[in-house]
Amino acid sequence: MCVVFSPREIVSELDRFIIGQKDAKRSVAIALRNRWRRQQLEGQIREEVMPKNILMIGPTGVGKTEIARRLAKLAGAPFVKVEATKFTEVGYVGRDVEQIIRDLVEIAISLVREKKRDEVQERAHINAEERVLEALVGKTASPATRDNFRQKLRAGELDDKEIEIEVANNSNNSAPTFDIPGMPGAQMGIMNLSDIFGKIGGRTKIRKTTVKDAFKPLIDDESEKLLDQDQIIQEALCITENDGIVFIDEIDKIATQDGGAGAAISREGVQRDLLPLVEGTIVATKYGQIKTDHILFIASGAFHVSKPSDLLPELQGRLPIRVELNALTKEDLRRILTEPEASLIKQYIALMATEDVHLEITDDAIDTLADIAVDLNARIENIGARRLQTVMERVLDEISFTAPDKAGTSFKVDATYVRQSVGELASDVDLSRFIL
């Protein structure tokens, strides 16, 4: 399922979206390549090769989450991002850490289902076309009549004609499930029962729609008929175990310092619950059991108050690769504004173009934006590249508000305009603390 890249290619791909942080990119690139290397092995040694989990250390807004997210997208692997602070020790009210793996399985099933849908799309389209023809001419029409209508259908001559179609009734698919007390991971509820009875009874509903709009629901309906649900689940469980990536953010918030009590005990409990998950255990899900031995865990934290050594020694040992991400400089912020494929500058220019407004942001304006962001990060709170979004919104506030009334016009944003928009706020510490 995963796409294979060399470490150099992975870093090159990440460079398209993330500025700097070479060490972090190299570490995740090697970790991803090692998964492919492991899968080329055979026999006992393949089971013995464990993923080298990663701990990213660095201030907020420097690219920790983005690196992990882009990596998973690049690999086509199941990926889940969680915050360590959202979980509680087993026995306390709240989410337990095994929910991470259950969420990962759900994501894997969605990935596999989409892949399988693409594989049967052509066949589903043919079947959907036959059903549209049946709705137009009936089941008893002669082959000549069907062929005549098929030509008209493909030419788009019948797009606006209204027909009635019969599709599966999926209205109960979003019904809730419930955990069975005393059996973590085992679930039973309305959804499971409706699945059982839905398949036996083949519940359908009649929809009145145009020929053009009928194709999508019919293709979806036909795709579902062609999919083997058991095969999807088995493949999803396999890629979860071998290709899954779990990103645990804010792990520094559950690190306990000496002398802590009360809440610190619960935080230590979360760490202890994470230990078997990271080391390798079996988690029960409603689709089957998942071995976590070969799931890659990437943890990250700013470690402003605590330090990595405040984590439980056992957990530190299970995060062997340490990567420190650097705080962003003015040059980094300037590059973030302009270089990535979907940089902030390109995003705002594209947004204004939808209103037929031509937006030009000069080089000196970009320098000034980076200057202001660096200054605010230094004086108030260092939130990294996220500060650029705050400053950009403030600068373009007036242009965004009046854009619908000024179609066909051009706006030029230079250094003077930037200073006029945020200069006074940026220089007033009390105001900038609240507004920027």
UniProtKB/Swiss-Prot annotation:
The principal location of this protein is cytoplasm
Q: Which SMART domains match?
A: AAA, ClpB_D2-small
Output the SUPFAM superfamilies linked to this UniProt entry.
P-loop containing nucleoside triphosphate hydrolases
Single GO cellular component term: HslUV protease complex
Q: Which BP terms does GO give this entry?
A: protein unfolding; proteolysis involved in protein catabolic process
Q: Does the keyword Disulfide bond apply?
A: no
Domain of life, per UniProt, equals Bacteria
Q: Which amino acid positions bind ATP, per UniProt?
A: 19, 61-66, 249, 314, 386
Report a single Gene Ontology molecular function: proteasome-activating activity
Q: Print the keywords alphabetically.
A: ATP-binding, Chaperone, Cytoplasm, Nucleotide-binding, Stress response
Q: What is this protein called?
A: ATP-dependent protease ATPase subunit HslU
Q: Tell me, what does this protein do in biology?
A: ATPase subunit of a proteasome-like degradation complex; this subunit has chaperone activity. The binding of ATP and its subsequent hydrolysis by HslU are essential for unfolding of protein substrates subsequently hydrolyzed by HslV. HslU recognizes the N-terminal part of its protein substrates and unfolds these before they are guided to HslV for hydrolysis.
What are the subcellular locations of this protein?
A: Cytoplasm
Q: How does it assemble?
A: A double ring-shaped homohexamer of HslV is capped on each side by a ring-shaped HslU homohexamer. The assembly of the HslU/HslV complex is dependent on binding of ATP.
Gene3D superfamilies per UniProt:
1.10.8.60, DNA helicase RuvA subunit, C-terminal domain, P-loop containing nucleotide triphosphate hydrolases
Coiled coil (residue ranges): none
> Keyword Hydrolase on this protein?
no
PANTHER family, sorted: ATP-DEPENDENT CLP PROTEASE ATP-BINDING SUBUNIT CLPX-LIKE, MITOCHONDRIAL-RELATED, ATP-DEPENDENT PROTEASE ATPASE SUBUNIT HSLU
